[in-house]
């Protein structure tokens, strides 16, 4: 089934409103979810939405309240998200980081006691749209075993970086595991196999079964280099921001548990180094040089840009099981679907 971005956004807002979420918070959450689907990160789009609905019903995600700034300097802040929707907390966290960067050149905001926030790239893009460099990191429930180990104690730990440019969308949003766990959940829902070489079962044997992988371990991307980056993000989005880490991280997949992961949001103002327009021209020049080396050379962000253009025109495809689940949620809340 195919729906328009507007239909998806409207449904999410209606459901969240019916569950007691304010219009402001519902719109923020819907924007992040639709952005994920438009960019092609369908494992973190509306396919993940039923998890949030379940968390709200169970009380692990709070529908109302405010974030609390626990500690603050001119360039740094630590936020307690008070278990609100993760999209809302991260959005407000990056807004604060951007404001700090306007004054000092850099804003760094750490978050704990929040929830799964969807795609990391949305928040980095917020900085980019303000002519700043945005960097977002988060940790997750354990899914990745250390190199040489068999027991998952690391999250998939994504990192996203967005850079302002006049002519291009320059951005990367990636898991530091060989695959995001959301991709495994999506493959399991669709009864699809996963590629070889990205996961092992609970006995350490290679598997293409997403369910065995979910009960086993995802491999780090890029061998020891990916493992090292995953390890470092666990610290930057865990101990640094007063959040849990390793086997103590809960609630990013299982909505029955209070979420204990952390986020680190960074905004850097290039204009504090030199003229912002000159910086963006230099970025454009570099991209042109990269693209001049071959006919089909892509830069980080090209695939997302092409996906957005395609899906804004053609719509967002939903699989049968997801449609059934969304209809079930809507029926429970007496919401009439328009599609």
Swiss-Prot record:
SUPFAM superfamilies hit by this protein: L-sulfolactate dehydrogenase-like
Subcellular location: Cytoplasm
Reaction(s) catalysed by this chain's protein: (S)-malate + NAD(+) = oxaloacetate + NADH + H(+); (S)-malate + NADP(+) = oxaloacetate + NADPH + H(+); (2S)-3-sulfolactate + NAD(+) = 3-sulfopyruvate + NADH + H(+)
GO biological process terms held by the UniProt record: tricarboxylic acid cycle
NAD recorded as keyword: yes
Pfam families for this protein: Ldh_2
Membrane spanning stretches: none
Annotated family: Belongs to the LDH2/MDH2 oxidoreductase family.
Function: Acts on oxaloacetate, sulfopyruvate but not on pyruvate. Has a higher selectivity for the coenzyme NADH than for NADPH.
Protein name as it appears in the record: Malate/(S)-sulfolactate dehydrogenase
Gene from which this protein is expressed: mdh
């Amino acid at each position: 089934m195919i729906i328009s971005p507007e239909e998806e956004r409207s449904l999410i807002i209606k459901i969240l409103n019916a569950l007691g979420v304010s219009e402001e918070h519902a719109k923020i959450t819907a924007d992040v979810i639709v952005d994920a689907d438009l960019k092609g990160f369908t494992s973190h789009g509306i396919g993940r939405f039923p998890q949030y609905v379940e968390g709200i019903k169970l009380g692990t995600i709070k529908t109302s309240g405010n974030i609390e700034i626990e500690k603050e300097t001119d360039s740094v802040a630590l936020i307690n998200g008070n278990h609100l929707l993760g999209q809302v907390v991260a959005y407000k966290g990056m807004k604060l980081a951007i404001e700090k960067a306007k004054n000092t050149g850099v804003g760094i905001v750490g978050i704990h006691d929040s929830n799964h926030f969807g795609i990391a790239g949305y928040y980095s893009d917020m900085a980019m749209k303000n002519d700043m460099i945005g960097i977002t990191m988060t940790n997750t429930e354990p899914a990745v075993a250390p190199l040489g180990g068999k027991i998952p104690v690391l999250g998939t730990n994504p990192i996203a970086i967005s850079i302002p440019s006049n002519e291009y969308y320059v951005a990367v949003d990636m898991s530091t595991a060989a695959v995001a766990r959301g991709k495994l959940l999506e493959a399991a829902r669709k009864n699809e196999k996963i590629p070889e070489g990205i996961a092992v079962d609970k006995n350490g044997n290679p598997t293409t079964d997403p369910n065995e992988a979910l009960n086993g371990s995802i491999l780090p991307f890029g061998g020891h280099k990916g493992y090292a980056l995953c390890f470092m993000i666990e610290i930057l989005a865990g101990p640094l921001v007063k959040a849990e880490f390793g086997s103590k991280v809960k609630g990013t997949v299982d909505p029955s548990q209070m979420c204990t992961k952390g986020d680190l949001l960074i905004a850097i103002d290039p204009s504090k180094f030199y003229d912002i327009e000159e910086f963006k021209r230099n970025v454009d020049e570099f991209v042109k040089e990269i693209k001049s080396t071959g006919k089909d050379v892509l830069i980080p962000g090209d695939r997302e840009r092409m996906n957005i253009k395609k899906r804004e025109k053609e719509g967002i495809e939903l699989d049968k099981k997801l449609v059934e689940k969304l209809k079930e949620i809507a029926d429970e809340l007496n919401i009439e679907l328009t599609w």
